[in-house]
Design a protein with these regions (language model features):
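Conserved catalytic-site loops of classical short-chain dehydrogenases/reductases
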Residues: 5-6, 40-45, 82-85
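Conserved NAD(P)H cofactor-binding loop of Rossmann-fold oxidoreductase domains
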Residues: 10-15, 149
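Catalytic loop of short-chain dehydrogenase/reductase
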Residues: 41-79, 91-92
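Short, small/polar-rich loop/turn modules that mediate ligand/substrate recognition or access, typified
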Residues: 78, 83, 139-142
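A glycine/serine/threonine-rich, flexible loop-to-helix segment
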Residues: 79, 89-113, 155-164
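Conserved SDR Rossmann-fold cofactor-binding beta-strand/turn motif
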Residues: 83-93, 145-147
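C-terminal substrate-recognition "lid" of short-chain dehydrogenase/reductases
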Residues: 118-146, 151
Length: 164
């Protein structure tokens, strides 16, 4: 397999496998493919919840671990001239979030507490990923919170039992 210029860790789940997938999976992929000469950029997809703690405990812990690991990787690959950052999104309109989006009562509650009254589109997320991995050559070791100011209302806590 040809070496990669860019590694993007985008795996994420919200279930009993949070730590294994979100944190250990990110570490495993990065250690295998991202820590080497020739790497240009490693991108972690974190979560606003890693900053504000407003989701399920295992998920928050796994994404908080990704934030710390981002800085560790940035220090280790800087001597290759490479960058490592995390993009820590709030709500994103994906199929994985359909149960939340389709639960009108929950969706309305979330939108009441979301300053921009919308979630990020997949295209907006891709634009950020492109910028931080391709255009950027200097910013490194940063956990970049892109949440439409959801963190400004960090008192919102997800219900214990998600509505499906």
């Amino acid at each position: 397999m040809e070496p990669f210029d860019i590694v993007i860790n985008n795996a994420g789940v919200q279930n009993e496998e949070d730590i294994d997938v979100n944190l250990k999976g990110t570490i495993g992929i990065t250690e295998k493919y991202g820590i080497r000469p020739g790497i240009r950029s490693v991108l972690m997809i974190g979560s606003a919840s890693g900053h504000n703690g407003s989701e399920f405990p295992e998920y928050v812990a796994s994404k908080g671990g990704v934030l710390s690991y981002t800085k560790n990787v940035a220090l280790r690959i800087a001597n290759y001239g490479a960058t490592c950052n995390s993009l820590d999104f709030g709500g994103v309109l994906t199929d994985l979030n359909l149960p939340v989006i389709e639960d009108k009562a929950l969706w309305n509650q979330i939108m009441e507490q979301t300053p921009l009254k919308r979630w990020m589109t997949v295209e907006e997320a891709a634009d950020w990923a492109y910028f931080i991995t391709v255009t950027n050559h200097f910013c490194t070791g940063q956990n970049i919170l892109i949440d439409g100011l959801e963190a400004g209302n960090a008192h919102f806590v997800w219900p214990e039992e998600p509505t499906v």
